[in-house]
Swiss-Prot record:
Active site residues of this protein: H169, C211
Protein name (record): Vacuolar-processing enzyme beta-isozyme
Span of the signal peptide: 1-21
EC numbers on record: 3.4.22.34
Organism: Arabidopsis thaliana (Mouse-ear cress)
Coiled-coil parts of chain: none
Description of the deletion phenotype: No macroscopic phenotype, probably due to functional redundancy. Slight differences in polypeptide accumulation in seeds with an increased amount of propolypeptide forms of legumin-type globulins. In plants lacking all vacuolar-processing enzyme isozymes (e.g. alpha, beta, gamma and delta) shift of storage protein accumulation from normally processed polypeptides to a finite number of prominent alternatively processed polypeptides cleaved at sites other than the conserved Asn residues targeted by VPE.
Function: Asparagine-specific endopeptidase involved in the processing of vacuolar seed protein precursors into the mature forms. Probably involved in post-translational proteolysis of seed storage proteins in the protein storage vacuole of developing seeds.
Keyword hit for ATP-binding: no
Residue(s) at site: Required for post-translational maturation and enzyme activity: C258
Glycosites: N309
InterPro entries, sorted: AE (IPR043577), Legum_prodom (IPR048501), Legumain_prodom_sf (IPR046427), Peptidase_C13 (IPR001096)
């Protein structure tokens, strides 16, 4: 009896501490719950250094709502994980939250039942300052090289960890940006090499959401840069938007555009529901791979790929994404229940958006007429691009050859001469108009023109013959003129 009375004050004190902690909405990190192991290694973060992050939404326009929603969601996860605002650099056009079509002005959601993810996100680089050049300068920590924006850069030191997340449209060897030129694989990899040579980070993890995103790293990503990369798709397939109107699950009825991207929501929803001090990068990779493949069916799904230094994936995710104390007692990573969700090819998401805008507009209204015109011009410009590339191939190689669609063996880069690729893209756009986000799918064709030794002069002649009658004036609504991609 005496022994029981002796322990009662201690139990009472513990209960008071737990009630106090719970009343604050979370448990204090210093108070270990019975289900949490007291692992000194997990508690001691002195050797981690500073966590840095670069978040890039590479698109603009309300039809691309999902990319900025993805990036804002990622920002909220990192902030909950303890990363400081001063250590997170955000590049996004910032034309969605307050867009006239946004049914909830000043907010963005990334899930049908999700909360606002826009509030508090810093406007480091917006509008015309969202450029490939600024992205490279930010990553290199070169404050003198950035133009416009907040001037914030990744001023990392040798013991620091860096997380890079990009979401947008892409194509073979290229990642889109709202202001051209785009991010080309060779330039991106060269930037990573420079960052490594500067000795200003310990390790880096990169997540890329884009069509053909594997082609950015295939055959050219070194393994000795202390960088681990995963991509939403391999080098020759699309990635997918999700949480789209008319699909399951569907966004709230007032939304006419997709809220997220399949690979992106897969990693973020995984991070939010697991203790990142216990979950490894490898575990998240396999979870995201399973979900992004639509559970190994690849029916509306893509192949998540990995590149670079694979030894990094044995590390815990908190080294890059931080640790949210609210997740302290969540279970170790388990594969989610196999529940396929509706998706749309990234390149068709804008058509889906235009269709729903047309469908929901009042009959006989100016808005309905304008939307139909934009939808018509968009599809017409797509047909023009496809037909032009096909005709150029016929002129250069003959009608029976399929040279421009050839895919190289795994492990080989898209093209041997990246400057040649840029040159061929520029020639095409000068004669045939902007590739737009849809036309980036033809980058492999231009790469194969280079790989087959075609000169710039021959490409000029073929493009002139194929597009001699092209007129920009035919496209008064569709944004076919967006500057040169290269």
């Amino acid at each position: 009896m005496a022994k029981s009375c002796y322990f009662r004050p201690a139990l009472l004190l513990l209960l008071v501490l737990l009630v106090h902690a719970e009343s604050r909405g979370r448990f204090e990190p210093k108070i270990l719950m019975p289900t949490e192991e007291a692992n000194p290694a997990d508690q001691d973060e002195d050797g981690v250094g500073t966590r840095w992050a670069v978040l890039v939404a590479g698109s603009s326009g309300y039809g691309n709502y999902r990319h900025q929603a993805d990036v804002c969601h990622a920002y909220q996860i990192l902030r909950k994980g303890g990363l400081k605002e001063e250590n997170i650099v955000v590049l996004m056009y910032d034309d969605i939250a307050n867009h006239p079509l946004n049914p909830r002005p000043g907010t963005l959601i990334n899930h049908p039942d999700g909360d606002d993810v826009y509030a508090g996100v810093p406007k480091d680089y917006t509008g015309s300052s969202v450029t490939a050049a600024n992205f490279y300068a930010v990553l290199l920590g070169d404050q003198k090289a950035v133009k416009g924006g907040s001037g914030k850069v990744i001023a990392s030191k040798p013991n620091d960890h860096i997380f890079v997340y990009y979401a947008d449209h892409g194509g073979p060897g290229v990642l889109g940006m709202p202001n051209t030129p785009h991010i080309y694989a060779a330039d991106f990899i060269e930037t990573l090499k420079k960052k490594h040579a500067s000795g200003t980070y310990k390790e880096m993890v990169i997540y890329v959401e884009a069509c053909e995103s594997g082609s950015i790293f295939e055959g050219i990503m070194p393994k000795d840069l202390n960088i681990y990369v995963t991509t939403a798709s391999n080098a020759q397939e699309s990635s997918y938007g999700t949480y789209c109107p008319g699909m399951n699950p569907s966004p709230p009825s007032e939304y006419i555009t997709c809220l997220g991207d399949l690979y992106s929501v897969a990693w973020m929803e995984d991070s939010e529901t697991h203790n990142l001090k216990k979950e490894t990068i490898k575990q998240q990779y396999h979870t995201v791979k399973m979900r992004t493949s639509n559970y190994n069916t690849y029916s509306g799904g893509s192949h998540v790929m990995e590149y670079g230094n694979n030894s990094i994936k044995s590390e815990k995710l908190y080294l890059y994404q931080g640790f949210d104390p609210a997740t302290v007692n969540l279970p170790l990573n388990e594969l989610p229940v196999k529940s396929k969700i509706g998706v749309v090819n990234q390149r068709d998401a804008d058509l889906l958006f235009l269709w729903h805008m047309y469908r929901t507009s009042e009959d006989g209204s100016r808005k309905k007429d304008d939307t139909l015109k934009e939808l018509t011009e968009t599809t017409r410009h797509r047909k023009h691009l496809d037909a032009s590339v096909e005709l150029i191939a016929t002129i250069l190689f003959g009608p029976t050859m399929n040279v421009l669609n050839l895919v190289r063996e795994p492990g080989l880069p898209l093209v041997d001469d990246w400057e040649c690729l840029k040159s061929m893209v520029r020639v095409f756009e000068e004669h045939c108009g902007s590739l737009t986000q849809y036309g980036m799918k033809h980058m492999r064709a231009f790469a194969n023109v280079c790989n087959n030794g075609v000169s710039k002069e021959l490409m000029e002649e073929a493009s002139t013959a194929a597009c001699g009658g092209y007129s920009e004036a035919r496209y008064t609504v569709h944004p076919s003129i967006l500057g040169y991609s290269a």
